[in-house]
Amino acid sequence: MEDYVKIEKIGEGTYGVVYKGRHKSTGQVVAMKKIRLESEEEGVPSTAVREVSLLQELKHPNVVRLLDVLMQESRLYLIFEFLSMDLKKYLDSIPSGQYMDPMLVKSYLYQILEGIYFCHRRRVLHRDLKPQNLLIDNKGVIKLADFGLARAFGVPVRVYTHEVVTLWYRAPEVLLGSPRYSTPVDVWSTGTIFAELATKKPLFHGDSEIDQLFRIFRTLGTPNNDVWPDVESLPDYKNTFPKWKEGSLSSMVKNLDKNGLDLLAKMLIYNPPKRISAREAMTHPYFDDLDKSTLPAACINGV
């Protein structure tokens, strides 16, 4: 830790306080996340340190770079590259009655999918994607923060400040208590974020797990074994759920064109194996008019 100096507190993340800091000798500005774990007395589990150290290998222009993992008196500090703005703050800053430029929506979504595909290929899930952990710079680049931390530290029900962790972007298989889930959970979250990029409003903003599920069901219909094999045997599925018919996604997301709505619907398919993958989504016609050669990952993809 002696290599870094804290400049100021910039926020409170899922796992602890986040500081803006600087590397003393290089002057590099960084984000310093102090990880606060439930079992504070026992110190940091070695499994968590091992898991998180592997994340230093995730090097991609659309993934926030983990630069260092440091221990100080049984506290774990994660040192990340610094970006000053997150997507939530940016969406909140757009004046009332105005919306994000449709080409910027497209560019951001494509870059998010690039970052997710890169991590999924390396068997790393995010599990807690939301606008707050999508960071942006002033050149049109968006990067995913906190990839892999859920596996290292778990996804807490509450932030250490006791603020409830948002359920708005959580996939239905997670909400229904599925013991096994995989990469489609991140695609679902990305779909809900896609809708929010277009409308500035969360697509499904529940205030409890059951309210979250019912908001999804009211729009997409209550799932059953016909549309999602074995959903009725998931731990938190109840046969007493109201049986809503599928509503209209297009009436909730008015700012998307036909291709955009088609891609969104494919990202929000109930049955996880049938949900579009990040890689498949990147080849969807919605992106046909996006100049991918200008995107930060173009050099590594040979575009």
Curated annotation (Swiss-Prot):
Classification via Gene3D superfamilies: Phosphorylase Kinase, domain 1, Transferase(Phosphotransferase) domain 1
PTM sites of type Phosphotyrosine: 15
Active site, per annotation: 128 (proton acceptor)
Enzyme class: transferase
Keywords associated with the record: ATP-binding, Cell cycle, Cell division, Cytoplasm, Cytoskeleton, Kinase, Mitosis, Nucleotide-binding, Nucleus, Phosphoprotein, Serine/threonine-protein kinase, Transferase
Binding site for ATP: 10-18, 33
Molecular-function annotations in GO: ATP binding; cyclin-dependent protein serine/threonine kinase activity; protein serine kinase activity; RNA polymerase II CTD heptapeptide repeat kinase activity
Subcellular compartments: Nucleus; Cytoplasm, Cytoskeleton, Microtubule organizing center, Centrosome
Catalytic activity reported: L-seryl-[protein] + ATP = O-phospho-L-seryl-[protein] + ADP + H(+); L-threonyl-[protein] + ATP = O-phospho-L-threonyl-[protein] + ADP + H(+); [DNA-directed RNA polymerase] + ATP = phospho-[DNA-directed RNA polymerase] + ADP + H(+)
Coiled-coil regions listed: none
Modified residues (Phosphothreonine): 14, 161
One GO CC term on file: nucleus
Protein's UniProt keywords contain Amino-acid biosynthesis: no
EC id: 2.7.11.22, 2.7.11.23
InterPro entries: CDK, Kinase-like_dom_sf, Prot_kinase_dom, Protein_kinase_ATP_BS, Ser/Thr_kinase_AS
Protein kinase domain boundaries: 4-287
Example of a GO biological process term: amacrine cell differentiation
Keyword Cell division included in the entry's annotation: yes
Record's function text: Plays a key role in the control of the eukaryotic cell cycle by modulating the centrosome cycle as well as mitotic onset; promotes G2-M transition via association with multiple interphase cyclins. During G2 and early mitosis, CDC25A/B/C-mediated dephosphorylation activates CDK1/cyclin complexes which phosphorylate several substrates that trigger at least centrosome separation, Golgi dynamics, nuclear envelope breakdown and chromosome condensation.
Family to which this protein belongs: Belongs to the protein kinase superfamily. CMGC Ser/Thr protein kinase family. CDC2/CDKX subfamily.
Quaternary state and interactors: Forms a stable but non-covalent complex with cyclin B in mature oocytes.
Protein name: Cyclin-dependent kinase 1
